[in-house]
Amino acid sequence: MLITKSSSECHVAVLAFPFSTHPGPLLNLVQRLAVEAPDVIFSFISTAKSNESLFSVPNPENIKPYPVWDGVPEGYVFARKPQEDINLFLKVAAKGFKLAMQAVEVETRRRIGWVMADAFLWFSSDMAEERGISWVPIWMSGGACSLSVHLYTDLIRETVGFSGISGRQNELLKFIPGFSELRLGDLPSGVLLGNLKSPFSIMLHKIGQALPKATTVLINSFEELDPELNKVLNSNFGKFLNIGPSNLTSPHPLSNSDEYGCIPWLAKQRSASVAYIGFGSVAKPKPDEVVAIAEALEASSTPFLWSLRDTSKQYLPEGFLKRTSELGKIVPWAPQVQVLAHSSIGVFITHCGWNSVLETIAGGVPMIGRPFFGDHPINTWMVENVWKIGVRVEGGVFTKSSTMRALELVLSHEKGKKLKDQIGHLRELALKAVGPKGSSSQNFNNLLEVITGHNL
């Protein structure tokens, strides 16, 4: 079968990391590109399970989903090990994507001219190089802070070493380019802390080594958030483009499901009075921390909206739901973007995952951070010490007293007003960045010109 590539028609292979919140923002970007470049074919390659969810609603005709094997053998029984599904996928991903790209070319009869991939798929750099085509990775999972640290992993390891790491968490590192200082204990997992030989840690290390080879590196952020780090990253990459926040460039429709009535309930609350509690789809507080949050909310009489999995409700103090039925609302899921945009929300108690950070900046809501893993610690460091738009819960875990102190500080203390003012300032910068003449909009147009061949 003849495979062609005409000068007017391009073919971009989009390789997704099919876990957590990675695929959604990537597809959102591709949707924007597809609308602006109708002659370009975008072949979106992810697992069948991921694609089934992503493509349940109509997409532009020039975006086509294709499957890649998830690496789970037939009849496999999961042992519930950490990152078990990710590790299975990573073992077969390189070969799987290579075969999928070959199949896509046969079906479309159009040779792939670009590889746009989640940066977690570092091996896609080699795939693009073998084909002699451009590689455009996108850092979906974090901001410039975590990207910079992974870029300088070797420098950090050589400078800090590995001895006695467990007792050095509070040591301040002042040699990482772009950071005035950073607490050692807030480095992302896989740099110095955690199992450095795990497939996930190895993947993160290889990302930092591969990214300088990219034609263009994209990031789900906006330039004005991290000007110093952006200078460093610009000096390391041929082209570095902030094209977010994706929650503002591709906002969710207002008709998003609110089956549990969160928004009508919020409408009955006082302005900036409610604590919204949510830890994303992966992070999960321990039972004693669920108890601590509940006791702090009740003791402080803080109105609350809590997105809490049904499996965790069993850990709530006996009688808590009945005693606080007028004070708060617990739901298994909440439309977070809409919730954070509501005027009654005064604080967001969060794990500080990157999407949650961007969404709360867009809502102008200060944070109380409780990091769990991955980039949560470094995001929390930035929230408290650099951007000054929130606080880390004392000791990094929830106790009744630490949670009450954090709530009082953000909702009642003078510092809370400063946090609110600062995040309001960042909100305005983010909105300006995605405006018609904003930095993220200009960067998107730059990317569009590169892909369509008008700015090679």
Swiss-Prot record:
Gene3D superfamilies: Glycogen Phosphorylase B. The keyword Aminoacyl-tRNA synthetase does not apply. InterPro entries: UDP_glucos_trans (IPR002213), UDP_glycos_trans_CS (IPR035595). SUPFAM superfamilies: UDP-Glycosyltransferase/glycogen phosphorylase (SSF53756). UDP binds at S281, W333, A334, H351, N355, S356, E359. GO terms for molecular function: cyanidin 3-O-galactosyltransferase activity; quercetin 3-O-glucosyltransferase activity; quercetin 7-O-glucosyltransferase activity. GO terms for biological process: anthocyanin-containing compound biosynthetic process. Pathway: Pigment biosynthesis; anthocyanin biosynthesis. It comes from the Eukaryota. It holds the Pfam family UDPGT. It catalyses: cyanidin + UDP-alpha-D-galactose = cyanidin 3-O-beta-D-galactoside + UDP + H(+). Keywords: Flavonoid biosynthesis, Glycosyltransferase, Transferase. This is Anthocyanidin 3-O-galactosyltransferase F3GT1. It comes from Actinidia chinensis var. chinensis (Chinese soft-hair kiwi).
